[in-house]
């Protein structure tokens, strides 16, 4: 039994139950969320506070992405030549687009120098270790770019929401996380922390799409399903985590990802504009879209 009184651990379920998203949509989803999804066209933005009414056009997206991926190739060449170490942490709401954003970063990079770290639940041995220990072994070596698809921030959010850690463990995490990250930065690691945030209606629409698409059903995890009723608990945990782990030396970059195309471009621009690498085309890099990209103050806008 976890601290919330439940004996069920969604991490131990063998797969996402067929039809669970549809049942939630029909029987339990808030009426305004359900109506927004039912009335919308495919490219409509569902959030009423998002600064754009529709997704970026595919033509504009492709043109900008191609230019940015050329810059990423330059960045990787500089990382390899200079021995730099770069670590990118991707956190966010479920279905916010973390994996897709990482994919666009790596699309034209040499995979030998651009690793993805996506850890499963900790083993018994790992649970007995210092919490950060299993993440440390995956930090970048000289010449490497490492993408964490979820990271040590599991403790601040999902572990807390599902009762997989107690309050003492979580408080210890918050006491240690900023000194830990400052040590990484002081040692020369370029550290970028991304929080991708998506509105409730858009999240449910993406879950529903995954459930109906045989090629995407693997993306729908038991934790996603179990979390459908925990939106408010997630909101509180996210707010606490961003507030307590943001600093000038290891800041959070929050990206509103209701439009995946704009979110991917903003994330890539954040990294490219944050590192001085050789032969940078500053006009091509530009600046992240401030309407959807900023600090913790915009996360729940």
UniProtKB/Swiss-Prot annotation:
EC number assigned by the record: 2.7.4.-
Q: SUPFAM superfamilies, alphabetically? A: P-loop containing nucleoside triphosphate hydrolases
Q: For the region Disordered, what residue ranges are annotated?
A: 1-21
List the InterPro entries hit by this protein, alphabetically.
P-loop_NTPase (IPR027417), Polyphosphate_phosphotransfera (IPR016898), PPK2-related (IPR022488), PPK2_PA0141 (IPR022486)
Name assigned to this protein: NDP-polyphosphate phosphotransferase 3
**What does the similarity note say?**
Belongs to the polyphosphate kinase 2 (PPK2) family. Class I subfamily.
Task: Give the originating organism.
Answer: Ruegeria pomeroyi (strain ATCC 700808 / DSM 15171 / DSS-3)
Q: Name one Pfam family in it.
A: PPK2
Task: Report whether rRNA processing shows up as a keyword of the record.
Answer: no
According to the record, cofactor stoichiometry and binding are noted as:
Also accepts various divalent metal ions.
Q: What does this protein do?
A: Uses inorganic polyphosphate (polyP) as a donor to convert NDP to NTP. PolyP hydrolysis is slightly faster with UDP, but it can also use ADP, GDP and CDP.
Q: Does the keyword Transcription regulation apply?
A: no
Catalytic activity, as annotated: [phosphate](n) + ATP = [phosphate](n+1) + ADP; [phosphate](n) + CTP = [phosphate](n+1) + CDP; [phosphate](n) + GTP = [phosphate](n+1) + GDP; [phosphate](n) + UTP = [phosphate](n+1) + UDP
- One GO molecular-function annotation for this sequence? polyphosphate kinase activity
GO BP annotations listed: phosphorus metabolic process
Q: Which cofactor does it need?
A: Mg(2+)
């Amino acid at each position: 039994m976890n601290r919330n009184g439940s004996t069920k651990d969604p991490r131990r379920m063998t797969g996402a139950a067929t039809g669970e998203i549809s049942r939630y949509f029909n029987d339990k989803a808030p009426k305004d969320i359900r109506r927004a999804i039912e009335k919308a066209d495919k490219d409509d933005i569902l959030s009423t506070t998002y600064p754009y009414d529709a997704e970026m056009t595919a033509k504009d997206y492709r043109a900008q992405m191609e230019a940015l991926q050329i810059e990423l190739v330059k960045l990787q060449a500089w990382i390899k030549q200079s021995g730099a170490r770069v670590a990118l942490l991707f956190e966010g709401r479920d279905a916010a687009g973390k994996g897709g954003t990482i994919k666009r970063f790596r699309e034209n990079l040499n995979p030998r120098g651009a690793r993805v770290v996506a850890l499963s639940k900790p083993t018994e041995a790992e649970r007995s270790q210092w919490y950060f220990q299993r993440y440390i072994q995956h930090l970048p070596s000289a010449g490497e770019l490492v993408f964490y698809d979820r990271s040590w921030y599991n403790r601040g959010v999902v572990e807390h929401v599902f009762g997989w850690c107690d309050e003492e463990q979580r408080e210890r995490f918050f006491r240690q996380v900023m000194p830990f990250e400052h040590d990484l930065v002081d040692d020369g690691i370029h550290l970028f922390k991304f929080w991708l945030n998506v509105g409730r209606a858009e999240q449910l629409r993406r879950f529903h799409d995954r459930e109906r698409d045989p090629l995407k059903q693997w993306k729908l995890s038991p934790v996603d399903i179990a979390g459908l009723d925990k939106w408010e608990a997630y909101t509180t945990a996210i707010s606490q985590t961003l507030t307590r782990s943001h600093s000038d030396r290891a800041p959070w970059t929050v990206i509103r990802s209701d439009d995946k195309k704009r979110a991917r471009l903003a994330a890539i621009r954040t990294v490219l504009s944050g590192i001085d690498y050789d032969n940078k085309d500053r006009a091509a890099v530009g600046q992240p879209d401030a309407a959807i990209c900023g600090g913790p103050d915009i996360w729940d806008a």
